């Protein structure tokens, strides 16, 4: 299995602090609601992008998790601008505020400054109680120049949120199945229940984007939620195709192509656990035959 994996970290939930936990929006869910924000991400107009995202969250109240596309503040940047740190700090403050007001987690990627003039394509998962988790994109799209300025992440990150274990992934990671491979740990527990992807997949890669998320759901016996952008920029056009996918491979909810929309669906954790118990295929992975 991939090395450098962080132990699933909880979003502030403690069974001994139930009253405080419920007040801050941290509690165990049997059925979890996820909303994908499929947006036309405007080039370098971070204020407008955050304003649109705020309105989208207001139009879809009551979700446990709101998922945004890749680099939702600026659109996809291969060369980070000088004001990247300023944009990053304001955007992260915005995520904290939205998580608190919506009593839900807010998740999406943006440019994050690193030491020595480098950057990360960083996905933040901000919980209602203010807890922040992050994952740095591991597979950089070198064909598009992403590898010049960005530092690849070296660890997978799994967040334990309202009873669901959620693996954080970004766009191009989708094409590397071993990086997101699910497994059974030493205590017999399956590592994660849901993969969330912030994406910036172009229309030219339509077939891959339609196929790969379904494959990831089936092979890992998990739900997949993937938020993609629409619109166009200097790199091409984007059609959306944001979806929530069942472990069987069925589509639970899907956005309208080439339209801004909020895509909401539910995931059933008890049903997932029953399915895995009935068909325990993850126990049959033979790692030493390949690694």
Where are these regions (language model features)?
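Polybasic, lysine-rich low-complexity intrinsically disordered segments
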Residues: 6-7, 24
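Extreme N-terminal starter segment of soluble prokaryotic enzymes
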Residues: 30-36
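Cys-nucleophile CN-hydrolase/nitrilase-fold catalytic domain and related Cys-dependent amidase chemistry
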Residues: 46, 51, 55-128, 133-134, ...
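CN hydrolase (nitrilase-like) catalytic-core segments centered on the catalytic cysteine
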Residues: 90-107, 174-261
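Short beta-strand scaffold segments in enzyme catalytic cores
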Residues: 108-110, 122-125, 157, 242-244, ...
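Active-site catalytic loop in hydrolytic enzyme cores
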Residues: 114-190, 204-211, 274-281, 291
